[in-house]
Amino acid sequence: MSMIVRSLIVACAICGMDLAICPAAEAQTQDHTRGFSIARVQYDGGGDWYSDPSSLPNLMAFLTEHTTIVMAKEPARVHIDDEDLFSHPYLYLTGHGNVRLSEPQVDRLRHYLDAGGFLHADDNYGMDESFRREMKRVYPSKDFVELPADHGLFNCHFEFAHGLPKIHEHDGQRPQALALFEEDRIVVLYTFEADLGDGWEDAHIHNDPEPSRLAALQMGTNIVVWALTH
């Protein structure tokens, strides 16, 4: 996806314009994803890429209610090898286990990110080692940088004075928002030791306190807004 086409898709979504009347955007958008859709990455390696199934529908519903972004009816699902990868400006990856990319997938993901795409990876406890390994293959010369609490991502829509919130108290480590940059643009955001996806899930699944669920949804909103406007 070129930066121009990505910008058209984003502008149509944020301004409330139907993608059907934005020809360049429509050409890059499947019929079932009219409006902005978060695309879940289906990856190889044995990890449960499909975990937290109610998380993205709930986050997208929250975005519809609390932003002016025109949202699709449901999230998408994409494999790095899929022809329509470049029609999705925003990828989401999560799971508890091993993440593995083939060499062609490494090259293709790098091309996607360099062309203006964005990847949000949410640590669901168990994928950390393999995800960091694969990102080092994608960008051998880049290292994750922790975003400070005063970074604009934490106040672009909702205010998070202390940075990334801790949603699921799995092992007591502090949450970190880690980023890979291409110049000044975040191309990969890795939310580590936070487990935002658990907070996006239906309330009865993890029994997270309501303030934690709200914080997770608000943080997810900030990430989407930041990715689409930067």
Give the residues covered by each predicted segment.
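N-terminal secretory signal peptides that target proteins for export/translocation
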Residues: M1-V5
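An acidic, glycine-rich "communication" segment
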Residues: G46, S54, D128-H204, S212-L217, ...
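Aromatic-Pro/Gly-enriched surface loop or interdomain linker
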Residues: A24-Y90, H96-G97, V187, D195-L196, ...
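Bacterial N-terminal signal peptides
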Residues: S7-A20
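Alpha-helical scaffolding within the catalytic cores
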Residues: K73-I80, S102-R108, G172-Q176
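A generic secondary-structure signal for well-formed alpha-helical elements
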Residues: T67, G117, Y139-K142, A227
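Active-site-proximal beta-strand/loop segments in catalytic clefts of secreted hydrolases
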Residues: V41-D44, D81, L93-H96, A115, ...
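Short alpha-beta junction capping motif
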Residues: I38, Y90-E129
